[in-house]
């Protein structure tokens, strides 16, 4: 375990707190709390923008920001409900971070959407004369910092944007924020797996307690030797 991961370990009291609302009502998370924590979805950075302050659970003594798992779970539900309103084939997901390539590809396979992994070709959403021009109804980005070209184009033509945002994110032009560790390999796999499953639940393609045929591990980008 890295120093960063050690710094985000939670006490039993904190774990109990994260499974209840501020009024003390027990929350049923989309996956068990320990599953979220072991994937590191709550691990932030040493920087926090004012846009992300409302999603912070605590700040470690060394200055590392830790995200509130309850709010991650809540925003995954909000995003899934929002995305489910659009035609499956009109959902475009992009990722320029290598660790996000497999999660995005598997996610798009499950929800039957389109995806662009790697470099986002300029004009994809704005230049109808290009062969690769597409007209999605909603855009999902893995990281506003690295997927900026896609965000600029979507905002220019009025496409709503859903984004995974870490503590250091700027959220200009983002319509639906999912606060989360959008850099970690295991975190990205779990986030996209949960989002895919919840979208199918919202579409009523699977029961409210149903699962998808792929495992979280199937969404994980493999490390090269």
Swiss-Prot record:
Question: Please, one GO biological process term?
Answer: translation
Under Pfam families, the record lists: Ribosomal_S2 (PF00318)
KW rRNA processing (keyword) present: no
Q: Which CDD domains match?
A: RPS2
Which SUPFAM superfamilies does the UniProt entry name for this protein? Ribosomal protein S2 (SSF52313)
UniProt KW keywords: Ribonucleoprotein, Ribosomal protein
Gene Ontology cellular component terms for the protein in this record: small ribosomal subunit
Give one GO molecular function term.
Answer: structural constituent of ribosome
The family database entries (InterPro entries) matched by this protein are listed as: Ribosomal_uS2, Ribosomal_uS2_arc, Ribosomal_uS2_CS, Ribosomal_uS2_euk/arc, Ribosomal_uS2_flav_dom_sf
The UniProt similarity line reads: Belongs to the universal ribosomal protein uS2 family.
Instruction: Read off the NCBIfam families from this record.
Output: uS2_euk_arch
Q: What is this protein called?
A: Small ribosomal subunit protein uS2
Q: Which organism is it from?
A: Sulfolobus acidocaldarius (strain ATCC 33909 / DSM 639 / JCM 8929 / NBRC 15157 / NCIMB 11770)
Q: Which gene encodes it?
A: rps2
